[in-house]
Amino acid sequence: LVQPTSEYTSRGKGHQALTLLGYHSITDVEIDKNPSILQQFDKVVMLHNEYVTRAMFDAITNHPNVIYLYPNALYAEIEVNYVDQTITLIRGHNYPEQEITNGFDWPFDNTHPYEYDDICLGMEFYKTKDGWMTNCYPENLFLVDTEQLFNLLKLIKDL
């Protein structure tokens, strides 16, 4: 029997599972245009939001209870032009200087080494200043390991 897998679908299955469980979704655009929107929620579950504006970064990192479900969130600073419908990389991913990795110099960046662990055999949440982070990329749990998926979703609910 071959188990279904996917290669980095950028949190699509996680979003679908949380939506089916009744979690409210907010788009990046909504947060960027109205950063205070997050204040109405006791908990914010971040997916793989790698490219964010400064307004989004500040709104998310100032919320007291964020669950960073995927590593590599908040990695690069962008600017959005809603009139021209363009996104411009401002900082991060070795830009504008080679030594710049995280565009916000964020001390809680957990991209390396966790972004590429998609097996999640020893998946854990660990505490940060504003919430919790995972130590692996859990996307394939939504297809393969129902027991571990159940435990993950229960933990998200309880945090």
Language-model features: where?
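Aromatic-Pro/Gly-enriched surface loop or interdomain linker
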Residues: 1-37, 83, 99-159
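Short alpha-beta junction capping motif
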Residues: 37-82
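C-terminal substrate-binding/active-site "lid" region of AdoMet-derived donor-dependent transferases
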Residues: 76-99
